[in-house]
């Protein structure tokens, strides 16, 4: 089985796979870690520096870079026609990116064609993706709230869960009328304690570093 990268256009929803659709073979995959945004201030009369990186409550991250190298055996004329097809779909476009090595997650980023080349037999293309810091779980997480104390586990990324409830509900002393409430409940990394006097459904998108 050939390892593939799947690209899904954010704008159109059209999906293309590196081998099945483009006919190129993945030979190298680099997934960079997002760099923490470290902010320090030197204060006169103080040893070291003052670290304000978590001034807003939690550490933030820069974008991360994904880089993929693909190769194929083509005649030069056929190869440049293929490069044109790949570039038309990917270059400068924002994509959901699914890697073979992490089947439960996807990345979101803008793709660029870094380079392409060919010799008498071998064509090569390098695609870089400037991606958001977190990778996202493919499946949306659902949690059924019950009367009493609920423990909702969340991954690394802080999220705001949507709440759907058929009747009025109070969660951690806040009252929500019947209906759908978008981005209603803040969930941080780990176990979140929610005290409810009714029932409802939480849905949220989990993300990991």
Q: What is each model feature region?
A:
Residues 1-209:
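Extracellular/virion structural assembly segments
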